[in-house]
Regions:
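Short amphipathic, basic-aromatic surface patches that mediate peripheral association
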Residues: 46-57, 118
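Short acidic/polar inter-strand loop motif in beta-rich domains
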Residues: 74-76, 113-124
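Contiguous beta-strand segments within globular domains
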Residues: 35-50
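Short, solvent-exposed, Trp/other aromatic-anchored flexible loops in extracytoplasmic proteins
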Residues: 81-106, 111-114
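Short, compositionally biased P/S/T/A/G/V-rich stretches that sit at domain boundaries
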Residues: 17-38
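Short beta-strand elements
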Residues: 121-134
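A glycine-anchored, Pro-Gly-centered beta-turn/N-cap motif
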Residues: 39, 63, 102-104
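Short coil-to-beta strand junction motifs in C2/discoidin
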Residues: 57-65, 125
Length: 134
């Protein structure tokens, strides 16, 4: 009976959001909002008020970045973020990436996820920026 209780409790613990301090802030260091970039360019991620930890590491006050590319409607903030062509996961704790996008206007935004890719109970979401790819 004890094992059955554990089996029921574990999934809810895994699916639980983590808490982020109110002052936590995610931001894109570069490129700048409105910048024109080459088809291949580097995006540098910023985070203040929290630390970066790889996915799978359940350490309070930490998370890892997810880059939202051309996302008009945010995904569920209560479930693990899906990995798609528009939602890039950086579960290794990376703080930058090189993107290759087609010419035109694009939007970029960061969303911090906890150890199981779930956004924090008070989501740490950057401002959305726009870039123009040459």
């Amino acid at each position: 009976m004890c094992l059955m209780s554990l089996g029921i409790a574990v999934p809810s613990a895994i699916a639980a959001p983590s808490h982020a301090p109110a002052e936590a802030k995610a931001y894109i260091i570069s490129p700048a909002d409105g910048q024109t970039v080459s088809p291949e360019f580097t995006v540098k991620f910023g985070l203040s008020g929290m630390g970066v930890a790889p996915a799978g590491i359940d350490k309070p006050g930490t998370g890892h970045h997810h880059l939202l590319i051309d996302v008009d409607k945010l995904p569920s903030l209560e479930d693990p973020l899906p990995s798609t062509t528009q939602i890039k996961h950086f579960g290794g704790g990376q703080t930058e990436t090189t993107l290759e996008l087609p010419p035109g206007e694009h939007t970029l935004q960061l969303l911090l996820g906890n150890y199981s890719h779930i956004p924090h109970d008070n989501p740490v979401l950057s401002e959305k920026i726009e870039v123009t790819v040459e």
